[in-house]
A protein has these predicted regions:
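ATP-binding Walker
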Residues: 11
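A glycine- and Lys/Arg-enriched "phosphate-lid" helix/loop adjacent to the NTP-binding pocket
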Residues: 97-154
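P-loop (Walker A) phosphate-binding loop of NTP-binding proteins
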Residues: 8
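Walker A/P-loop
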Residues: 14
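ATP-dependent small-molecule kinase phosphotransfer cores
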Residues: 32-100
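NTP-dependent small-molecule kinase module
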Residues: 130-189
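Hydrophobic anchor at the beta1->P-loop junction of P-loop NTPases
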Residues: 5
Length: 189
């Protein structure tokens, strides 16, 4: 079973994904290109930074899409939990110029069996990021304060993803984790 944990930064994606890995015996997948190309994390970060500094949203979409495609392709018939899949890429880069890239990615490599979209208001997300690291540079980015979920949900609906929204606004981290683990258990293939 392939599960994707999605949402804007500060909703708890990594914590939830790692809990699913540990408690439900899934393989945790983040930065699959690091594994594909056998790169050290700092080397992958340098490559990513160069790509992200390009003015071409098509190039960025393909680059991030390659990660998603490799993760799905190399983990067939395994229980994996992905710390992000396609949604944040689509939120930041999805537009008329890149739509075909996202269509092709889904058409050729498929979708997760279950996508869990974690939501929270921008204020709550910024507080969580600040609590985690008061010096996080993301706190100064105006785009981090965007809501973002309307565009993501449209994408999920357009491409018929099997998804569940978990509003984390008033949930504790442990409540969010339990809710997500129960969703995975109830849909486990």
């Amino acid at each position: 079973m392939i599960v994707a944990i999605e949402g804007m930064d500060g909703v708890g994606k990594t914590t939830v994904a790692k809990s699913i890995e540990k408690d439900l015996n899934f393989i945790y997948v983040k930065d699959p290109l690091k594994d594909l190309f056998e790169l050290e994390k700092n080397h992958l970060e340098k490559i990513s930074e160069k790509i992200f500094n390009q003015p071409d949203d098509k190039l960025i979409s393909w680059y991030l899409g390659l990660e998603d495609c490799y993760a799905l392709s190399s983990n067939k018939n395994k229980n994996i939990v992905m710390d992000r899949h396609v949604l944040l890429n689509y939120f930041w880069n999805g537009n008329e110029n890149t739509e075909k890239i996202f269509e092709t990615q889904i058409e050729m490599f498929g979708k997760p069996d279950l996508t869990i979209l974690l939501t929270a208001s921008p204020q709550t997300r910024m507080k969580r990021i600040s609590d985690r690291d008061p010096n996080d540079p993301d706190l100064n980015k105006p785009t981090m304060k965007e809501y973002g979920y309307d565009k993501m949900i449209k994408f999920l609906d357009k491409y018929n993803f099997n998804y569940v929204i978990v509003d984390t606004e008033t949930l504790s981290l442990s409540e969010t984790i339990e809710k997500c683990k129960n969703l995975v258990k109830s849909r486990r293939i």
